[in-house]
Amino acid sequence: TVSPSLINLNNGGVSPAPKTVQEAMKRYFDYSNEAPSYYMWRILDQGREPLRKNLANVAGCSPEEIAINRNSSEGLETIIFGLQLKAGDEVVASLQDYPNMINAYKQREMRDGIKMKWINLELPSEDEDYLVRQYVNVFTTKTKVVHITHIINWNGQILPVKKIANEAHKRGIEVIVDGAHSFAHFDFKIPDLDCDYFAASLHKWLYAPIGTGVLYVKKEKIKTIYPLFATNENPLKDDIRKFENLGTRPFFIEQAITKAIEFHEMIGIERKEKRLHYLKNYWMEKVKDIPGVKLNTSLHPKWGCAIGNVGVEGKKPNELDSFLFTNYKIHTVAITWENIVGVRITPNVYTTTKNLDVLVEGIKAFVK
């Protein structure tokens, strides 16, 4: 059901849901409104446990480690504000992390006196030792937590999460992973990352309805985290469901996630990953040798998948972004964040090579 009037190359923000997902959401919405309090809580809410099992299957973990929420920011802030940190405890994070997470840590720093240790990554990078070293070099005996973004949203850089996590755990440091852009994007299971906490938005690469997310908490860690929304029971109880006390929520959206999982499994994660990487490299290979063009994303599958970023010397990102939309009706997003300057291009499985040929034509015309 994608728009025929423009070429959407900003799927990294929110991906369109397949028609089957949209139809399920509308059907559940109509159903809810027949008698809201009855159908929402007594009928639709009964589908949460089967949904939890289905999400756990995609994640490769126990259903008792999966909480269903609204987006990755909510999931990550549940952990950031729920961790029992005290004044002087150190947290390591990157300036390339997502702004909501940076702001959350700054708020804890202001309110609770924790100490933030910020690293600044030079990207793109295919040097695993360099990337791991940037984190490890700032670990101290006071470091309690390291926050790692699996895929940097600004340019699509994949970080070696497991290597960093291994080094952190050797030192007794807990590991939080921002998986907003990695979950259902390429082939991995959450336990493979050796992290303690992981959160993702399902409306990105799982193609679920807008406003759906998942939070993973390693089983033995659940009892150590306070929920973001209070419960009427012990907040440190050993039950993942304590993180779902959101009050009235859109059950019709939540239950349509199942159709997104079916669509995802129909494609298959291996085939999906190959398709997404192919599309990214298709356009990047065609523009990389144009004078003045700078690629801000690796072409190697270990370090990038669907998300790419391109800059043009002497031009601001918003100039290229505006040019592409005004002249070619291509929707992208201009990025100027720390040392990443360019336009983010994010195709999806439905994107055609003809769409990307138009993009290449537009970049060539802009450079002239």
List PLM regions with ranges.
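Pyridoxal 5′-phosphate
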Residues: T1-K368
